[in-house]
From Swiss-Prot:
It is found in: Secreted; Cytoplasmic granule membrane. Residues 28-38 are annotated as: Central sheet, part 1. GO terms for biological process: defense response to bacterium; defense response to Gram-negative bacterium; immune response; innate immune response; lipopolysaccharide-mediated signaling pathway; negative regulation of interleukin-6 production; negative regulation of interleukin-8 production; negative regulation of macrophage activation. The cytotoxic action of BPI is limited to many species of Gram-negative bacteria; this specificity may be explained by a strong affinity of the very basic N-terminal half for the negatively charged lipopolysaccharides that are unique to the Gram-negative bacterial outer envelope. The gene is Bpi. SUPFAM superfamilies: Bactericidal permeability-increasing protein, BPI. Keywords: Antibiotic, Antimicrobial, Disulfide bond, Glycoprotein, Immunity, Innate immunity, Membrane, Secreted, Signal. Residues 1-27 form the signal peptide. This is Bactericidal permeability-increasing protein. The keyword Transmembrane helix does not apply. Residues 37-219 are annotated as: N-terminal barrel. Monomer. Homodimer; disulfide-linked. Residues 463-482 are annotated as: Central sheet, part 3.
Amino acid sequence: MAWGPDNVRKWSSLALLAIVGTALTAATDPGFVARISQKGLDFVCQESMVELQKELLAISIPDFSGDFKIKHLGKGTYEFYSMAVEGFHIPDPQIKLLPSDGLQLSITSASIKISGRWKYRKNILKASGNFQLSIQGVSIIADLILGNDPSGRITITCSTCDSHINSVRIKVSGSMLGWLIQLFHRKIETSLKKTIYKKICKIVRNSVSAKLQPYVKTLPVVAKVDDITSIDYSLLAPPMTTDKFLEGQLRGEFFWRGHHGPFPAVPPVMNILPNNNYMVCMGISDYFFNTAEFAYQESETLKITLRDQLLAKDARYHLNTDFLKTFLPEVAKKFPSMGLQLLISAPLFAHLNIQPSGLSLSPNLETRAFVVLPNSSLIPLFLLGMKTNASLEVNAMKNRLIGEMKLGRLLLELKQSNFGSFKVELLEDVINYLMSTMVLPKINEKLRRGFPLPLPAGIQLINSILYSSQNFLLLEADLHRT
């Protein structure tokens, strides 16, 4: 995390179907794993059916006409026109897992209702009216193949589609001669059945390419965190399906927006057990968090400048030379009642560990102290090394990962002084006070804004729960459309 000082760079705000990355190590293990269970696919299916149903209701049925011959009446002509789909009922749609192959959309026992106009002509004999067409037992089977393009973005295509119609029944009204149409209803029903049959799979294929593929493209490949860092969520390989879940293996790596440099480590293996009680689960490795620290460190923004103006008037301590009298009297005498500036930084990488007991790290910090002269120039005083232990609590909120850090007491070491040595213990209370009241709140302000998770547009997590495991966090949650 980066700390926003007053005149150092400041912090800024940080298809669904396959929710689910290029480092020096060319790591093939993911830093972030996203899985969707059958329960999650059921949610996806219901959401997808809304759009598919709209497309099916918009089926355009062309007018058709023909000749007929009836004994004793001779030849005549008929025409069916102004046809529109009034209803397309899909009672039990499913998206099934096809191990190693992808997904399968399955629709059975659907029904369609179509209305329109008809007319008949035989010499001077004319008749016309309305008709209702009932199509029962409509089934659709479509196989969906999931892949990834060179950029690591998910792709989805409809590889095969087949539809079947059990029965078609027509009912005419509006004329006493409607019985004529009923005499050759099989011909009409067969013609309409062929028309609908040809259009169903065309619509399914078009919905996948024109609706679903653009939607899954809203799954982020690169997610901006702030003006300093982004997260690489690119797919390392095509999504994998088993009989339990669909899995996307993502790079899961923070990088400095000024330079996407390599991280000198590889992600750990995450042993994630299947759990169908939630729609999705996400394995978030320690690699993910450590690349965040590395990116901010590479950008040289892990520092904060403190001056007295930033402290409250009733603060326990004030940053001026007066409080140095007890351990650096020479400084207090040479620079009476002048301001102090503290530059607190994290020059060394501190590896974050994830264990069943939680997330922890041992930061090594530094504080450089300066006297601020009336002309704003700085006189260096001393350099302190600071060691502490820290813990990190992580939660999920909506579409972000949020956190809060807790710091242990800092232990100080005098590394350098331009005005003689002194007992650093005399400074411990001051430094710990400033860390707890000025520095830590800024860190936690950033952590509360959080980091974006790899979710498609309009989808948030609900009922989320997080577990700490060895080297990774497991996030389980349900999905909600906003």
